[in-house]
């Protein structure tokens, strides 16, 4: 689902504000399903929300951290869980700037929907 044609050409905060109504509309489904619904993920990827902190070489915005925080805030107003998911992926995205460029490109550069996050699962969750 594309929110606006060529939305990825807009500034990250403008893209976040454009997709925020879709995030808000999905909030009950997110809570009930304990996951981001596929149609919302499509919208977030279409707006390149997960790529805000990625280096340009990997197809990201290479935004300042202050700008990324504004993106998270715009999404969090719509649904805090969605902002949390984006924030989790942001830590890995920032790491791309410190990796060998070829390695970072292999992870994020080939697929515009590539997202990486890590963390420990709750006991018994797997």
List where the protein language model places each region.
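A short, structure-level motif marking secondary-structure boundaries and short turns
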Residues: 12, 24-27, 56-57
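Generic N-terminal amphipathic, Lys/Arg-enriched alpha-helix
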Residues: 2-6, 19-26
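Glycine-rich flavin
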Residues: 38-46, 51-126
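Charged, low-complexity surface patches
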Residues: 12, 32-33, 64
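A glycine-/small-polar-enriched, mobile loop at the entrance of the PLP active site in fold-type I
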Residues: 24-34, 81-83
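A short alpha-helix capping/helix-coil boundary motif
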Residues: 17-21, 49-51
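N-terminal, positively charged, Ser/Thr/Ala/Gly-biased leader segments
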Residues: 7, 12-15
């Amino acid at each position: 689902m594309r929110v606006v044609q060529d939305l990825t050409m807009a500034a990250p905060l403008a893209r976040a504000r454009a997709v925020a109504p879709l995030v808000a509309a999905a909030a009950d489904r997110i809570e009930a399903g304990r996951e981001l619904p596929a149609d919302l993920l499509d919208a977030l990827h279409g707006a390149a929300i997960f790529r805000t902190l990625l280096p340009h070489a990997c197809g990201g915005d290479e935004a300042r951290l202050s700008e990324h925080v504004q993106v998270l805030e715009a999404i969090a107003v719509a649904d805090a869980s969605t902002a949390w998911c984006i924030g989790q992926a942001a830590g890995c995205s920032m790491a791309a700037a410190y990796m060998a460029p070829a390695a970072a490109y292999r992870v994020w550069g080939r697929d515009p929907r590539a997202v990486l996050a890590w963390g420990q699962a709750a006991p018994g969750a797997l």
